[in-house]
């Protein structure tokens, strides 16, 4: 069976007509059997999708026919199975949510650093290296010596900067993220705050892991990705982590050996924080998934939106979801 191509792509570019782009883009992806999520906003496009080699090539060709996206950045990795359940093209205020008005990499952005030059930069003792990802991403892997902002969402990054960094003291700042989009927007924010030398890893961690040999790498651990692969290693090989359905955090083999781990229901991180009602609701959903799997049906996918609605109604009416 041919491998599935997983393409992470984004571009900050002025798209005042972004709403008009949605129908055609969704139709193309559906026709090609592509699954994943694409975000459209006035500031650009962002997303990760998966499909056959021909399908992904067709999507990239379609996007690059628009002169504004002719040089859209994309990174590829591979999976043995489709890592997404359905295709979504969403309209958003921001393609990556910082929550600070007026911040635009289309107007001001930091210095891009190629993976080949990254080790030299972050080995400089005068450079402050910041991981702009969330805490659960940092926990399973990061660059040696990188600062963890301990954020749970990208919206919290400006507060971290305000409390912990000073343009007068931190002369050189280097940032990185999964694919490059968060650190690119963060660099725009940092420049607006008065920082002068702001660098960010071009192509993100994924490009670094693809490009730099493991024996030369300063990366430690695995890189969390937002699909069913959960994490990737050097060479973009699928990592060793799984994911807890309940809290969505990556879980290790040690976590799965815990008495608090129940497949599809809980893990050591969320077990003690989960109400009995929620645990019962998740257990019922897992039961339905297993039934569908035994019947050879897709419980999640085309019917996911319907399930989501039922799930929301069940929370309102205090009943268990039914499918």
UniProtKB/Swiss-Prot annotation:
It is an enzyme of class 1 (oxidoreductase). Keywords: Oxidoreductase, tRNA processing. InterPro entries: Rhodanese-like_dom, Rhodanese-like_dom_sf, TrhO, TRHO_N. One of its GO terms (molecular function) is oxidoreductase activity, acting on paired donors, with incorporation or reduction of molecular oxygen. It catalyses: uridine(34) in tRNA + AH2 + O2 = 5-hydroxyuridine(34) in tRNA + A + H2O. The active site is at 177 (cysteine persulfide intermediate). Pfam families: Rhodanese, UPF0176_N. The keyword Transmembrane does not apply. Its EC number is 1.14.-.-. The keyword Secreted does not apply. Residues 123-217 form the Rhodanese domain. Disulfide bonds: none annotated. SMART domains: RHOD (SM00450). One of its GO terms (biological process) is tRNA modification. NCBIfam families: PRK00142.1-4. Belongs to the TrhO family. Catalyzes oxygen-dependent 5-hydroxyuridine (ho5U) modification at position 34 in tRNAs. This is tRNA uridine(34) hydroxylase. It comes from Methylobacillus flagellatus (strain ATCC 51484 / DSM 6875 / VKM B-1610 / KT). The gene is trhO.
